[in-house]
């Protein structure tokens, strides 16, 4: 919403009222940022990156264009760079991403906006992932839409303009960029661990059961071998009224039993994890193996 209001204000608002929109937009972005830890992890999962950190990028970029020099320092903030690179760290291979909460493992291909975000924060890994994904999406037929950019790319005229202005630069970068080296990552704000060893990539979830778009998945793991799924999180069903109702956890995809987690059934009673902040991982420790 903030990016779209700024676009409208920049084109239509009288010059004397523009500072009001700038001030409110800065406040809106601050409110958004307070829900992120310094590590930049998106608790909603990789599929929501395009609707969260990436739209924040456009809002910040617009502020920098409307008020030159005022907001430029934001791009050197570690938290902003961490938010930008989150999507790189969750990427496995091809169309696959580690997924938790209401997130599909097919989280969409990266594109021009991600490239521009990477350029702003000087992230070669993000620029590389975005450029290569975009080049692949343009060159390969894709009947299953595994590589196709997110549908949100098609509903905003400004995104089309960004693409038209930057596409040739993105494609040129894709031809020369070396693949980004995968790395291990621990996100303490949400409790997400990413480990890669040889052919294997592991994702593990600590944290709690009060995330945005929460599933009862504390302790769950996903595993990939040679870029293909081995142990999966099935993600979420098609959204319905029930998904965002008090009956949310009657849906099987939300329940702990469907997240590679144990279920206890003493005396015919079934015990599963419950939603809520108090239902959380305890005594979490990350070994030095991440630095190996």
For every predicted segment, state its role.
Residues 1, 48-49, 213-218, 259-260:
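Histidine-centered active-site/metal-ligand motif
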Residues 37-45, 67-72, 210-211, 241, ...:
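Short helix/strand-bridging catalytic loops that position acidic/His residues to coordinate divalent metals
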Residues 219-284:
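Active-site rim segments in enzyme catalytic domains, especially the processed small/beta chain
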Residues 1-47, 172-175:
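Active-site lining segments of carbohydrate-active enzymes
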Residues 1, 21-28, 41-55, 75-83, ...:
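Secondary-structure capping and boundary motifs in well-ordered enzyme cores
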Residues 36, 64-67, 266, 270:
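Alpha-helix capping/termination and helix-coil
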Residues 12, 53-230, 288-292:
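Carbohydrate-active enzyme catalytic cores, enriched for enzymes
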């Amino acid at each position: 919403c903030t990016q779209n209001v700024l676009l409208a204000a920049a084109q239509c608002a009288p010059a004397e009222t523009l500072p009001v929109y700038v001030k409110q937009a800065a406040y809106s972005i601050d409110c958004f940022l307070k829900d992120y830890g310094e590590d930049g992890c998106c608790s909603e999962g990789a599929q929501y990156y395009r609707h969260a950190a990436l739209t924040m990028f456009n809002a910040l970029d617009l502020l920098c264009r409307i008020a030159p020099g005022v907001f430029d320092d934001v791009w050197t903030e570690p938290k902003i760079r961490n938010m930008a690179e989150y999507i790189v760290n969750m990427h496995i291979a091809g169309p696959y991403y580690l997924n938790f909460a209401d997130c599909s493992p097919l989280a969409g291909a990266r594109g021009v906006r991600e490239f521009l975000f990477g350029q702003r924060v000087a992230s070669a890994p993000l620029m590389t992932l975005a450029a290569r994904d975009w080049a692949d999406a343009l060159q390969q037929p894709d009947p299953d839409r595994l590589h196709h950019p997110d549908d949100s790319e098609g509903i905003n005229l400004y995104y089309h303009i960004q693409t038209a202005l930057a596409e040739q630069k993105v494609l040129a970068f894709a031809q020369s960029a070396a693949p980004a080296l995968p790395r291990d990552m621990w996100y303490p704000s949400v409790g997400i661990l990413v480990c890669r060893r040889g052919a294997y990539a592991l994702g593990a979830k600590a944290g709690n059961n009060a995330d945005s778009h929460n599933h009862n998945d504390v302790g769950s793991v996903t595993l990939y071998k040679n870029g293909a799924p081995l142990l999966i999180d099935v993600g979420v069903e098609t959204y319905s009224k029930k998904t965002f109702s008090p009956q949310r956890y009657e849906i099987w995809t939300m329940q702990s039993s469907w997240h590679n987690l144990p279920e206890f059934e003493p005396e015919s009673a079934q015990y599963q994890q419950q939603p809520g902040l108090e239902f959380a991982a305890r005594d979490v420790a990350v070994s030095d193996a991440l630095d190996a």
